[in-house]
């Protein structure tokens, strides 16, 4: 019989909150008897915005802002029903986007 995998992608602007949420998921999965592959750090997406400092003149004077989106990937191999229940009840920090594929 084919083994089931649960793939979890996490995204956040703050890498500390992301790593904390990742460790919570890994600990929950290991406690219920599933094997975990990861966390795998994916490339950080950097989005830059350039705006004029002055509203009227001085085109040469500009300011740059950036948003960094950090990502992690987890694979849970052979999850038990207890693993799925524990992951559904898990309360993660605000600001972490979670995508789950089965």
Swiss-Prot record:
Bilayer-crossing regions: none
Annotated InterPro entries: Ribosomal_uS10 (IPR001848), Ribosomal_uS10_CS (IPR018268), Ribosomal_uS10_dom (IPR027486), Ribosomal_uS10_dom_sf (IPR036838)
Keyword annotations: Ribonucleoprotein, Ribosomal protein
GO biological process entries: translation
A molecular function GO annotation: tRNA binding
A Gene Ontology cellular-component term: ribonucleoprotein complex
Job description of the protein: Involved in the binding of tRNA to the ribosomes.
Family membership: Belongs to the universal ribosomal protein uS10 family.
Quaternary context: Part of the 30S ribosomal subunit.
Protein name: Small ribosomal subunit protein uS10
